[in-house]
Design a protein with these regions (language model features):
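AMP-forming adenylation/ATP pyrophosphatase catalytic core
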Residues: 1-166
Length: 166
């Protein structure tokens, strides 16, 4: 399966609203494929890892990187435009850096810096492994590899589902 895929899902029963369903997320560790409406494919927030800065980072990032690592600590936000595909239009948003647990590390509790970008307008077709380039005006700030891209609307639905199950 591929994120965004619509055909060949072999779901058996249609969605309650009769609209097509799409692959929203693939979870290889649990062997799950999450499906939902097209609207839930729109990505509002991207988390990048292994950032590379072009020159001196913006002051908010530079100040953050000079501090001692601590889980959950985040930088001040700064305005950016983010570009995910080479020929796609950049999308405006705000970004911050955050210390998060490195889920790919062999050592539990290891921390990594994640670049978190909240987009003003959603993007479609964003997937882990792609590169995200950040700009301020015409200045390239740097790039990072997308570790997670998700829809805040989908998280709201997940929260509703969890609260309803309690």
């Amino acid at each position: 399966f591929t994120v965004g895929q619509r055909k060949g899902l072999a779901l058996g029963t249609p969605a309650p609203d009769g609209k097509p369903r799409f692959v929203l997320e693939i979870r290889p560790k649990t062997n799950e494929v999450i499906v939902g409406s097209r609207e839930l494919l729109s990505i509002d927030e991207i988390r990048g890892i292994r950032a590379t800065w072009a020159g001196i980072p913006v002051p908010e990032a530079e100040h953050f990187l000079a501090q001692e690592p601590k889980l959950g600590v985040r930088s001040e936000t700064f305005d950016v435009t983010a570009q995910v595909r080479a020929h796609a239009d950049p999308v405006r948003g705000t970004a911050h850096l955050e210390w998060a647990e490195d889920t790919d590390a062999e050592t539990p509790g290891k921390l990594r810096v994640e670049t978190v970008v909240r987009l003003h307008d959603g993007l479609f077709g964003v997937a882990p492994g792609q590169t995200m380039v950040l700009y301020q005006g015409t200045r390239v700030l740097g790039q990072s590899t997308i570790a997670r891209a998700y829809s805040l609307a989908r998280e709201d639905l997940d929260d509703l589902r969890e609260n309803a199950a309690v």
